[in-house]
């Protein structure tokens, strides 16, 4: 049995994540977008439409080409705003880091279960 306290390590990981460059960039980019209520509103509307689109895809519903085109155009339009484009870049980098960490943990757990 190891003397390692998993909860202490989890807190250590959480601190490391919140001090990481991807996390800090994401927080800063989010603050920049939130300074402008119109940008925040546009971003929330886009997220809502993306969620509806994803839900329809998961349920296997037919999605009209027009809907796909409208969503793509809406994303392209909102991405013209530098602060929002930076937010998307920062969010993508943070999510990638977070997913990588989850994958590392999952692989370690799976290999332990296989032993």
From Swiss-Prot:
Pfam families tied to this protein: Com_YlbF
Domain of life of the organism encoding this protein: Bacteria
Sequence similarity: Belongs to the UPF0342 family.
UniProt name for this protein: UPF0342 protein Swol_0655
Species the sequence originates in: Syntrophomonas wolfei subsp. wolfei (strain DSM 2245B / Goettingen)
């Amino acid at each position: 049995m190891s003397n390692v306290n998993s909860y202490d390590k989890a807190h250590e990981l959480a601190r490391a994540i919140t001090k990481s460059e991807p996390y800090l960039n994401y927080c800063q980019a989010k603050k920049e977008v939130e300074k402008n209520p119109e940008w925040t509103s546009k971003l929330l509307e886009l997220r809502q439409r993306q969620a509806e689109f994803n839900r329809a895809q998961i349920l296997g519903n037919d999605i009209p080409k027009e809907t796909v085109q409208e969503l793509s155009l809406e994303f392209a339009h909102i991405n013209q705003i530098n602060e929002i484009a930076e937010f998307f870049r920062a969010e993508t980098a943070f999510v990638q880091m977070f997913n990588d960490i989850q994958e590392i943990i999952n692989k370690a757990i799976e290999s332990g279960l296989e032993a």
